[in-house]
Amino acid sequence: MDDAGELRVLLRLAGPLILGYAGSQLMSMTDTAMVGRLGADALAGVSVGNGVYFTVSCFGLGCVAGMEAPIAQALGAGERVRARRLLWQGVRVALGVSLPLVVIMALSPLVLPWAGLGAATSREVGAYTWARMLNVVPFLVYNAQRSYLQASGITRPIVISTVAGLIGNAIGNYFFIYTLRLGVAGSGIASTLASTAMVLALAPAIAAVDAPPDPERRRFDRALVRTILRLGHPNGGQVVAEVGVFATVGVLAGRIGAASAAAHLVAITLASFTFCVTLGIGAATSVRVGHHIGAGATDGARRAGLIGLGSSSVFMLAAALVFFTCAPWLAAALTNDASVLAVAIPLLHVAAIFQLSDGLQATAAGALRGAGDPHAPLYANLVGHWVIGLPVAVALGFFAHQGAVGLWWGLSLGLTAVAVGLIGRFLWLSARPIRRV
C-alpha cells in the first residue's frame, strides 16, 4: 500500500473515532457549562474534582489499553479467535482494576484540607467526587469494548453510543443540577448514568462481530490477562503521569484563587476538545501500526506512524490559529464570570502554543502502543512533565508571580519535551524489525 492509500485507511478509521472522542469531550463541556452557572466555587470544585477523577480512573484506562496492541496485532495476523478472547480478558481487567480505584476515589476528598483549597471549593470537590466515583466501572468497561471494536475496524457503534451518552448526559445534568437542585453532585450522577448507558449500547455491536465459534472465549485466561497487565501497567503509569500533572496544576491554580482554578477548567476543557482529534488519529495510528506488525511488515508500521504524525500536525496547527484569534469568544461560551474570563483568555493563548506538541506526543504514543512498547511513553511523560514541566510551572507561577499563566507555560514546555522523546523513540524502534507481543 502506498502513502496515499495508507492515509485514506487511517483517516477512514480515525474519522468515527474522532467523533467518538469529541462526543465524550462534549460531555465534559456540557458539565462545565451547566455547573459554570452555579458560580466560581462550583466551577472550581468541578475543576479539581475532574482532575482527581481522571487521575485515578486513567490509571485503569492505561491498564485496559494494554489490550490494544495484542488485539490489533492478532487481527493483523488473521487470529480472530485470539482477538475475541483478549476482549473478554480485557473486560475482566477493567472490572478488577476499577474496584480499588473506586475506593481511592471515595477516600480522596479526605486529603483536601492539606491541599490548601478554600472551604467552599473543598465542599464542592467532595460532593462532585463522591457522586462520580462509581463512573470508573462503566468508563473502563466501555474503553475495553471500544478497543476491540476499533481494532476490528467497526467504529459506527462507538459514535452512536457516544451521541446517545451525550444527549443523556445533557438531560441528566439539567434534571439533577437544576430540577432536583443537587448542584455539582447532580453533574457527577448524570455522568455515571450516561457512561452506563454507553456500555449497554455497545453490547449488541460486540455480539455482532464476525468471529469463529469459540466456547472458551469467556473463560479466564491467565496468560492473556498477564499480557494485558504487562503492557497495561506502564500505560497506566504514563496516563497518570500525564493527567496527574494537569490535575496538579489545577490544584495549584486553586491555591492562587477560585477564579484561577475555574479558568484552568475552562481552558483545559477547550484544549482537550482539540486534543480529541489527535486522540482519534493516535488511536487509528495504533491500530494501523499493530495491523502491520501482526502481518510482519515493519516498514508499513513505520509509514503508518509517520502519516499519523503528519495528520496530527496539520490539524493542530489549524487549532492553534483558532485559539489565538478566538480566545475571548471560546472562553465566554463556558462561563460568564468576568474574573474567570480575565484569566482564561491568556491561558488559551498559551494553549495555542502547545497545540502542536500536544498533538504530536499523543499520536507518537499511539504509534508506540501499536508497536507494543509501553515503557517509552511512561519514561517520557515522567521526565517531560515531572522533571522539566512542573518545576518550571511552579517557578513561573509562584516565584515569578505569573500566576496561572506561568503554570501553563510550564505545561507547554513539558509537552514539548514529551513529544520530542516519543517521536525519537518511534523513529529508532521502527528502523528495525518489531516483534509481536
Q: Language-model segments: what does each one mean?
A:
Residues 29, 33, 110, 144-148, ...:
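Alpha-helical transmembrane segments of multipass membrane proteins
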Residues 2-33, 37-38, 51-66, 70, ...:
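N-terminal transmembrane alpha-helices
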Residues 40-51, 126-129, 188, 258-273, ...:
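Small-residue hotspots at the loop-to-helix junctions and early N-terminal turns
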Residues 1-14, 71-137, 168-172, 177-233, ...:
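Short alpha-helical transmembrane segments in multi-pass integral membrane proteins
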Residues 12-31, 131, 135, 142, ...:
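Transmembrane helical elements of multi-pass membrane transporters/channels
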Residues 43-106, 139-158, 263-327, 359-380:
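Small-residue-rich hydrophobic transmembrane alpha-helices
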Residues 22, 26-44, 112-119, 175-182, ...:
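Helix-terminus/linker motif at the lipid-water interface of multi-pass membrane proteins
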Residues 162-169, 269-272, 349, 382-391:
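Small-residue-enriched core segments of transmembrane alpha-helices in multipass membrane transport
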